[in-house]
Amino acid sequence: FKEIRTPVFEHTELFNRSVGDTTDVVQKEMYTFNDNGGRSISLRPEGTAGAVRAYLEHGLHNEALPQKVCYLLSCYRYEKPQAGRLREFHQFGVECFGAGKPSADAEVISLAKSAFDNLGIKNLHLELNSIGCPKCRPKYTAALKEYFSSHADELCDTCRSRLDRNPMRILDCKSPICSAIAADAPTVLDFICDECRDHFDGVGRHLNALGIDFTVNPKIVRGLDYYTRTVFEFVSNDIGAQATVCGGGRYD
C-alpha cells in the first residue's frame, strides 16, 4: 500500500454525491462554508471520498491494477463529543482500487485485524454483512419502505424525511425509538441476488482460511451511501456505547 495525501477540505458536492445527501454525515455533521469565490467547501468528514477523487483526477486508474493506497489524516464531524467520538479525529484507512474478487475484501479486513493485533488491542470481534448491489437493492429498499411506512408516526423527523428517498438510512439512526423499530425490519440478506450471495460466501471462505473469526450481522449498513456488497465492523465491548473502532466495505 502506497501513502496518499489529500486536502483537508474539498468541494461540498464531492461528499453530497459520494457519502449521500440523506446520511447523518451530510445532513448534520459536516463543517461547510463558502470561500471567497463563493464556492461551497467542507472539511473532510472521512477519507475515502477524497482518495477516490485523487485516484481519478490524477490518472491512477490508467496504471496497473489493483492500486492500493493508505492514509492517516484528520477528519471533522459536528458530533456530540463522547467516549470514542470527538469532533476532530484521526482516521487511518486503506483503499484497494480495481480488485473485484472476494479475496480483496478479505485482504483489507485481514490488514485491519493485523494492525489491531500488532498494537496489542484485544477483545475485538468482527461483524460482517452484505448490503447487495444496484441490481438487488431496489427490492430490499421497497420492503424497507413498506415496513417503515407502517411506523411513520413513530419515527424521528430525520427518518421520516428519509422514508421515501433512502429508507436504508433509517437502519443507521441512533434514536432509541427508531433503533427499536429497525430491530424488526426486513434483513438485507433475504433479498441479495445470487452474485452478491456468492461474493459474500467467498469473503467468508477467505476469512475462514485466514483464521479470522467473524459473525454475520444483517443489521450493519454503515453510515455512508457509497457501499455495495461487503460491509464490516470491528466492535469492542470495552469502550461504551460507541463500540465500533473500525469499519469499511466495498464500493463498486
Question: Could you say what each language-model-derived stretch is?
Answer:
Residues F1-D252:
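TRNA-recognition modules of translation machinery and tRNA-sensing kinases, especially anticodon-binding
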